[in-house]
């Protein structure tokens, strides 16, 4: 938040860093949920039980549906119809990370996930992470034009924020989000599906203003990690 604000919130004069050993092993867990609410609540649930994934990502089901219409190499999404959560666990042994991942799977059963996959090999893990990294490009390929925003809100406010973001869509313009569940950073993408240029320019101004007001109302910031 402070780095992204580029000096508008505070000026850092001194930083003390503590180095930790590089993790030896990691285990990626990909979970599919039927509802956005349960997907976004999953991190709070596992955190309450002491699990601390090194990465926690979420992808809206609209993003996945769009990706499936394009010719992509990401075969893992073929049967995905819900919202995706990535949890990546790291540690000093394979047993350690596997134990964390299995405990996570057990905990989230109360939210009735549609599926949960342990992604074991480095090649499979890279395929899933490549899909996540390619999201912006995929959305740009799909839409006539695209505008991206980068808001951040408290993690507890993610469900209500994402609900409001989805409500910004119109018949000709789709608004969706994905991002970092672990810090509340949402990459909001406004997609021109079939609006003409003049309507698009007016709509993007209105939608952006509503989005920025939403971020502030949710105790967040207009800029997450990419600056102003």
Predicted regions and their residues:
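Noncatalytic alpha-helical scaffold of FAD-dependent oxidoreductases
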Residues: 1-228
